[in-house]
């Protein structure tokens, strides 16, 4: 047996076959429950429209994170047998500004060399197809791409008629707190949250932002769920916001904190931009924190740019919340 129950003594070799069969049977029954739930809604297409599959995934992710944060579920190197000092990891440093300028140049060259008349004709055909519902839209989109119409132009040709989809942001509550139960860090975070609310006359308000082309939002949703269960008022920004859009939403919602979730290495470009946008709007008092996959080599630069706190992988939600609340209470 290793450590505190990482390898239990309940199962021996002769029982392992039954144990695996039992787990397999459990998975099959739970999967069937999900299938029946979807069927009752009229199939997967209907279920997706209601947002049920996405919500179930987010609930499972929140439970999992809560068990990890509380130590109930142990992961070697994360919350059990952690190294006293992490070895530095060499990473490929990419100059985002240079990449952006290079891509803009390529696009300019592409547009200068393409047949604009052919592009306009192809895009007009797409708009007409969407309007009349006559013809093969996919075929027309492929033809437009062949004459070098961009994906944005093709989608704009459709948007003229049908508009653009706007995601409905739904959140869950109570899932994270039901799993962490009496975790000391979680309880401490709730106490600080109550202290802030008493001092300011309202709950601390945080906006979780996904900026640029970072489409990974499950971690951000889990963090939002955890903060809400601690006592924060939480606003969730849509995917692919620009720093300007996120700053505007933060000001309109009068938040105390903007939490930038970064999983696509855009933090050195996007975090300074949102801080600058908040300054333009006269709201330098809104603090900006950063969470996600942030190399330690980038921490100093982010702090110089104005980030108030940085939370890397493996940071328990309650630990991050305590740090945020301590910053807010110190102001």
Tell what function each PLM region has.
Residues 20-21, 45-46, 55-56, 85-87, ...:
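Flexible loop/turn segments at secondary-structure boundaries
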Residues 41, 48-50, 60, 78-84, ...:
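Generic beta-strand/beta-sheet core signal
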Residues 20, 25-32:
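Conserved phosphate-binding loops in nucleotide/dinucleotide-binding enzymes
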Residues 9-10, 30-126, 151-206:
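Intrinsic disorder at enzyme termini
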Residues 1-8, 13:
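Single conserved hydrophobic/aromatic residue that forms the stacking wall/gate
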């Amino acid at each position: 047996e290793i450590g505190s129950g990482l390898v239990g003594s309940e199962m021996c070799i002769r029982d392992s076959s039954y144990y695996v069969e039992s787990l397999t049977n459990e998975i099959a029954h739970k999967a069937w429950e999900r299938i029946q739930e979807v069927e009752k809604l009229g199939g997967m297409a209907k279920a997706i429209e209601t947002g049920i599959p996405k919500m179930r995934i987010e609930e499972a992710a929140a439970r999992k994170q809560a068990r990890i944060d509380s130590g109930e579920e142990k992961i070697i190197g994360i919350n059990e047998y952690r190294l006293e000092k992490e070895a530095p990891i060499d990473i490929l440093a990419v100059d985002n500004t240079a990449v952006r300028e290079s891509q803009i140049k390529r696009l300019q060259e592409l547009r200068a060399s393409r047949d604009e008349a052919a592009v306009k004709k192809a895009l007009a055909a797409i708009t007409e197809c969407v309007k009349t519902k006559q013809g093969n839209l996919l075929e027309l989109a492929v033809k437009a791409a062949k004459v070098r119409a961009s994906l944005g132009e093709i989608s704009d040709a459709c948007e003229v008629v049908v508009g653009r989809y706007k995601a409905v942001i739904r959140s869950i509550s109570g899932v994270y707190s039901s799993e962490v139960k009496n975790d000391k860090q979680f309880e401490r975070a709730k106490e600080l949250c109550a202290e802030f609310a008493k001092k300011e006359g309202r709950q601390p308000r945080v906006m979780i932002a996904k900026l640029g082309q970072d489409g990974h939002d499950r971690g951000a949703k889990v963090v939002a769920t955890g903060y809400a269960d601690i006592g924060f008022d939480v606003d969730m920004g849509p995917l692919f916001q620009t720093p300007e859009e996120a700053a505007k939403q933060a000001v309109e919602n009068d938040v105390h904190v903007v939490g930038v979730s970064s999983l696509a290495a855009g933090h050195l470009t996007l975090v300074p931009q949102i801080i600058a946008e908040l300054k333009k709007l006269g709201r330098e008092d809104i603090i900006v924190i950063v969470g996600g996959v942030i190399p330690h080599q980038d921490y100093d630069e982010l702090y110089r740019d104005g980030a108030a706190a940085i939370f890397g992988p493996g940071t328990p939600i309650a630990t991050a919340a305590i740090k945020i609340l301590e910053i807010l209470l110190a102001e």
